[in-house]
Structures are given as C-alpha cells and as structure tokens.
A protein has these predicted regions:
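N-terminal Rossmann-fold NAD(P) dinucleotide-binding loop
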Residues: 18-19
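NAD(P)-cofactor binding segment of oxidoreductase domains
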Residues: 72-108, 140
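Conserved beta-loop-beta element that borders a ligand/cofactor-binding pocket
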Residues: 143-164
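Substrate-positioning beta->alpha
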Residues: 168-170, 179-201
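Mid/C-terminal beta-alpha module of Rossmann-like enzyme folds, strongest
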Residues: 196-244
Length: 258
C-alpha cells in the first residue's frame, strides 16, 4: 500500500491504459470516475462510476454530464488521436471544463511520435518534429493543455506500448520483408506506463514534460525476434537494411519543468 492515500481521479478513456489504471487506483482506496464511448460486458461489475457518451457530440462537455468527475482533483486523458475526429479541440474543451470545475491536476498521455523519425538522440529538451497528422494533433494538444490555466499539468510522452495480451509482434509476424529492422526501438511495457501514471498523480509539480520509455534500445529486429520467441510465434521477416532512427531518453526521473 502507498504511504500517502492516492487522490480521487477521473479517467477519460477506459481502455488499454485506462482500465488497469482505474483498477490500480481503486485497489488503493481511491474513488474513480471514468468515461468511455460505450459499455461492454467487462465493464458491468467494475467498482467505479462509469459514464458512457461520445466526446465528439455537441453537448459532451455540459457540466451536468461530468457531475461525478467535478469533485476529483486529478483528471487523466488517455485517448489517442485515432479515437476522435477533432482531437486537439476536444482535449482543449476537456481542459477548459477541468478549469471550470477547479481541477488542480491534469495528466495527459502524449507520444514520442512528436519527435519525428530523424536519426538523433532526443530527451525532453529536443525540438519536436512531428511528421504525421496524428503527431501534429498531439503536439497542438500539449500546447492547449499548457495554456489551460490549470495549475498542474503533466504531459507524459509514451514510447511504443506493448504487453503479452496485446503485442505488436502479433501483427508483424503476418508480414514479409519488413522494413526498418535496424532502427533502435523506443518502447515501454504497459505495466511501466500504468505505474508512471499512478505515481505522477501523487506529486503535482507545476507544468512538466516527461518521456516514458524503457532505457534499453535494441534494434527492431532484435526486440521483436526476442518477443516472438517468448510468445511462441515465428520470427518476423525483416528485410536486410542499414537504416537508422531516433533514440529517446529522459532528462531525469521527474521529467522537465516547463
């Protein structure tokens, strides 16, 4: 158990990260409210308050819909850009609502994709270079949050997520002649990401940015071949190449103060 009781929380996005995070907070006696688009059979017996509605609807941010969230001092936003048509604008509205509810701490899962694909070493001081529309939306969202007026903002840029139940190697082994096998990989196990989110909620510290990645950086070929063996899958078919890629690090355990 934690020495200090965890805060009560609101989670927007009760999925791959949100569900284990909600369960972890509940197990530590935190009151949890969450939002997702639709209810599944797995959600029925969750010991949390769960609201279901579409964040893209015109009335999604009416205060009445968030009455079970308004008293929670920490709000998480865990949805990726693929889940929303107008991602940055939606997160901006979420942050504006949080400020209106006097929420003191927002925690947002960003992505290391904002650094682009150029071969270089990146920590939180590196200049972003988003190459995809998704990465550009994420970077715009970060700025909206920093400008929101909420006193404590944590932006966690996650590396590529993986775990045994939902592993990217399961898709890779279905392909042939995969490119980029020699590029270093920037990954983070889901358990590490969940623990990082959990610990961040205990320590608000103004506006902060942190990369959440594992310290090891094997090549894509090395990592996915090893992971395939663990899951009793055939080795992925990587094409020979000498391509290079970025390596992502973090400046310190607490990230970069902004």
């Amino acid at each position: 158990m934690c020495a200090v009781p965890p805060p009560h929380i609101s989670i927007t996005g009760l999925g791959y990260l949100g569900l284990p995070l909600a369960q972890k907070f509940y197990q530590h006696s935190s009151r949890v409210a969450a939002i997702k688009r639709s209810l599944t059979s797995d959600d029925i017996n969750l010991p949390i308050h769960l609201d279901t509605f579409d964040l893209g609807s015109s009335d999604a941010f009416q205060t009445a819909l968030w009455r079970h969230h308004a008293d929670k001092p920490v709000w998480f936003f865990l949805l990726p850009p693929s889940s929303l048509t107008h991602y940055a604008d939606t997160v901006k509205q979420w942050a504006e609502l949080a400020r209106a509810c006097n929420v003191q701490h927002l925690i947002f899962t960003s992505s290391t994709s904002v650094y682009g694909d150029t071969a270089r070493e990146c920590d939180e001081t590196a200049t972003p270079d988003p190459q995809t529309e998704s990465a550009r939306q994420i970077l715009a969202t970060e700025q909206y949050l920093l400008d929101s007026g909420v006193p404590n903002i944590d932006i966690l840029r996650l590396g590529g997520l993986y775990c045994a139940e939902r592993h990217p190697v399961s898709r890779l082994v279905q392909k042939q002649n995969i490119q980029g096998g020699n590029r270093p990989i920037n990954i983070v196990h889901r358990n590490i990401a969940v623990e990082s989110l959990f610990q961040t909620a205990f320590n608000p510290g103004g506006r902060r940015l942190k990369n959440i990645i594992e310290p090891r950086h094997p090549t894509r070929r090395e990592f996915f071949t090893e992971e395939a063996a663990k899951l009793d899958l055939p080795a992925p078919d990587f094409a020979p190449d000498d391509s290079r890629g970025k390596i992502i690090r973090t400046v310190c355990d607490n990230g970069l103060s902004l």
